[in-house]
């Protein structure tokens, strides 16, 4: 498959993730949209790595996946904390954590 197709797919995935972050108010959906954006970046890194014949992009994609795994743990803990106190997973309730 042509590498340009992978880059187009990556741009499409990133755009869908961006729209999800900007439009949705549910914290879980926003969180999934951010993960979709990270996966789009991973696809771009691996595609450029494949084009240039090096492993640098694949190694960077691996580190992005490790950081995303840590983000999942911390993000879900914060969302769970908000849900337990407000019984809602809306991002409008984020100011709750100030107190």
Swiss-Prot record:
Location(s) in or outside the cell: Cell membrane
Coiled coil: none
Lineage: superkingdom: Bacteria
Gene3D superfamilies listed in its UniProt record: 1.10.287.3510
Reaction equation(s) it catalyzes: a quinone + NADH + 5 H(+)(in) = a quinol + NAD(+) + 4 H(+)(out)
Membrane topology: Multi-pass membrane protein
GO cellular component, one term: NADH dehydrogenase complex
Keywords: Cell membrane, Membrane, NAD, Quinone, Translocase, Transmembrane, Transmembrane helix, Transport
EC number: 7.1.1.-
Transmembrane segments: 3-23, 28-48, 59-79
InterPro entries recorded: NADH_UbQ_OxRdtase_chain4L/K, NUOK/Mnh_C1-like
A GO molecular-function descriptor: NADH:ubiquinone reductase (non-electrogenic) activity
Its job: NDH-1 shuttles electrons from NADH, via FMN and iron-sulfur (Fe-S) centers, to quinones in the respiratory chain. The immediate electron acceptor for the enzyme in this species is believed to be a menaquinone. Couples the redox reaction to proton translocation (for every two electrons transferred, four hydrogen ions are translocated across the cytoplasmic membrane), and thus conserves the redox energy in a proton gradient.
SUBUNIT field: NDH-1 is composed of 14 different subunits. Subunits NuoA, H, J, K, L, M, N constitute the membrane sector of the complex.
Protein name per Swiss-Prot or TrEMBL: NADH-quinone oxidoreductase subunit K
Source organism (scientific name): Frankia casuarinae (strain DSM 45818 / CECT 9043 / HFP020203 / CcI3)
